[in-house]
Amino acid sequence: MIYQMQMPAKIEVDESSHTDCFGRFIAQPLERGYGVTLGNVMRRVLLASLPGTAITGIKIDGVFHEFAAIDGVREDVPEIVLNLKKVRFKSTCKRNCKTSLTLVGPMDFTAGDIIAQEGEFEVLNKDMHVATINAGATVKIDLYIGRGRGYMPAEENRPEGMPIGYIAVDAIYTPIRNVKFTVENTRVGQRTDYEKMILDVETDGSVSPDDSISLAGKIITDHVTFFANFSPTEEEFTEEEFKQQDDEFETMRRLFHTKIEDLDLSVRSHNCLRLAEIDTIGELVSHKEDELLNYKNFGKKSLTELKEQLEKFDLKFGMDITKYQMK
């Protein structure tokens, strides 16, 4: 007889404390020891693996290194960099971007003065102080904004081809401000040695607590699946079968790299995809239907047309194309 482990029927949400930025989630009952096991892995993934947007570098006219002072500005460059690291963004754009600012004093330069030139992002903490520009001073600054996961130190944030005076910034991509968990005993029938895990998640507002734990759970599941599907006996393939697999893989890889312009689409659908910055079939199928409908001017008619085109290639929305090394 196989022992049936206790599993939570569902994840409970503490509605009394729930906000757009904070959530308390309760998982019970759990077998003894699983509260700490699940709490640790959820905390690590939430803090280190969720995607977000952050400033990755800056360039200030007349400044050539990160330890300089700026004429007419109260703060020096290191202090300005520290303040910019705290600016939080909400973005649906997957590409890096740059925004240029001209600051004329006297003024209090805050995060709200950072404006996307093409609507790529939204600043969440608009009142965040960055610098004080004195009367008569004019400062021109370029901000480089990128997408990533977790945290990336400045020394790894120096792409090739950057202009002289480019200053790399420690990028705090993670949208999670804080995660903590506690484990308590709970009763099932006459037994009191089961566990209840309480997980507190605080975000910066760019993602909801509910979505953050859902995404973290998916990341964990994707990794654990490799172990669940493990077979100690490897299948034996003939040379012809290996060649067939390689040919099929290469065919799919080329298909996913095919440009959207090569599809027989209406002008409206082409324009919708261009505005959404979807350039290839691979980028298209990696989106879910509801994600596409969230883009500006993207309606059900365009979605139906795209589905018909994808069906010609036996493709669908929401596909995982990571193994085809899409770039």
From Swiss-Prot:
The keyword Nucleotidyltransferase applies. Residues 1-231 are annotated as: Alpha N-terminal domain (alpha-NTD). Keywords: DNA-directed RNA polymerase, Nucleotidyltransferase, Transcription, Transferase. It comes from the Bacteria. Gene3D superfamilies: 5' to 3' exonuclease, C-terminal subdomain, DNA-directed RNA polymerase, insert domain, RNA polymerase, RBP11-like subunit. Homodimer. The RNAP catalytic core consists of 2 alpha, 1 beta, 1 beta' and 1 omega subunit. When a sigma factor is associated with the core the holoenzyme is formed, which can initiate transcription. The N-terminal domain is essential for RNAP assembly and basal transcription, whereas the C-terminal domain is involved in interaction with transcriptional regulators and with upstream promoter elements. This is DNA-directed RNA polymerase subunit alpha. It comes from Pelodictyon phaeoclathratiforme (strain DSM 5477 / BU-1).
